[in-house]
């Protein structure tokens, strides 16, 4: 590619930023359409692929263009230690919504109700992909495809369905909302097509989502401890689901 920086600038506003080797690796592994990928050291990046991701090494060999460090730094908000970045096409919203709406899902949908922290949202998407969740949807103003979220998610947005919806647009299925006043989750079997909702750490569930919930559940927690990190709560809940046959 003769002018990767020029192509980058033309496409950046309409593409997903993959920031770092692991984000690019996961995106390629899960079928992302990558339109441009750059690195400051092509040989070192391909050696890293040989070591950590030999399955995607041929694809990275075809995609990566080496650029000078100042050029790379000009393309990203904050240089990544691996000095790798790429742009990919965002998956179809319509296809994601169709996938989320299926009534015979084999894994839960995670709902983040009005999340505030971009890093936490990315961490949830990363672990949801690891558990094979059908998808992660957010309500409120946070963009789940924000570059900081994608970076925190290590590119695993492409391994699951990630979208922003309203409470009225939540996927079908029994809605289990995590709330300190709910029943102990250890006494409940979560169905594979469950919709699992989590409020923000600061304000909890919104009134609209809480009113719509079919069941309120709580996580075991020592008295006088106020809350878990959002990603920790999601991980505990998905692990509980997985004990009955998930992942």
Q: What are these model-derived regions, one by one?
A:
Residues 1-54, 141-142:
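Boundary-proximal intrinsically disordered activation/regulatory segments immediately upstream
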Residues 87, 91-181:
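RNA substrate-binding interface of SAM-dependent RNA methyltransferases
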Residues 53-89:
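Glycine/small-residue-rich loop that forms an oxyanion/phosphate-binding "nest" at active or ligand-binding sites
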Residues 44-59, 148, 208-209:
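Short, aromatic/basic amphipathic alpha-helical patches
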Residues 86, 127-131, 141-144, 148-157, ...:
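Structured adenosyl-cofactor binding patch, chiefly the S-adenosyl-L-methionine
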Residues 177-223:
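Active-site/ligand-binding-proximal alpha/beta "capping" segment
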Residues 20, 116-123, 226-231:
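Amphipathic alpha-helical repeat scaffolds
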């Amino acid at each position: 590619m003769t002018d990767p920086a020029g192509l980058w600038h033309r496409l950046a506003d309409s593409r997903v930023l993959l920031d770092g080797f692991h984000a690019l690796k996961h995106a390629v592994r899960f079928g992302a359409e990558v339109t441009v990928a750059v690195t400051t050291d092509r040989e070192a990046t391909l050696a890293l692929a040989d070591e950590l991701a030999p399955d995607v090494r041929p694809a990275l060999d075809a995609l990566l263009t080496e650029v000078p460090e100042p050029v790379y730094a000009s393309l990203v908000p904050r240089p990544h230690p691996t000095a790798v970045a790429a742009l990919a096409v965002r998956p179809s919203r319509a296809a994601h919504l169709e996938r989320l709406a299926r009534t015979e899902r084999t894994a839960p949908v995670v709902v983040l109700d009005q999340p505030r922290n971009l890093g936490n949202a990315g961490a949830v998407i990363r672990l949801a992909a690891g558990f094979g969740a059908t998808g992660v949807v957010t309500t409120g103003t946070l963009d789940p495809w924000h570059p900081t979220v994608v970076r925190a998610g290590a590119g695993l947005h492409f391994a699951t369905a990630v979208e922003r919806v309203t409470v009225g647009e939540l996927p079908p299925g029994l809605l289990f909302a995590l709330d300190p006043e709910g029943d102990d989750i250890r006494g409940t079997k979560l169905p594979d097509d469950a919709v699992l909702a989590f409020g923000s750490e600061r304000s909890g569930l919104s009134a609209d989502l809480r009113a719509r919930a079919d069941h309120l559940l709580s996580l075991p927690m020592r008295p006088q401890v106020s809350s878990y990190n959002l990603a920790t709560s999601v991980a505990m809940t998905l692990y509980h689901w997985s004990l009955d046959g998930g992942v």
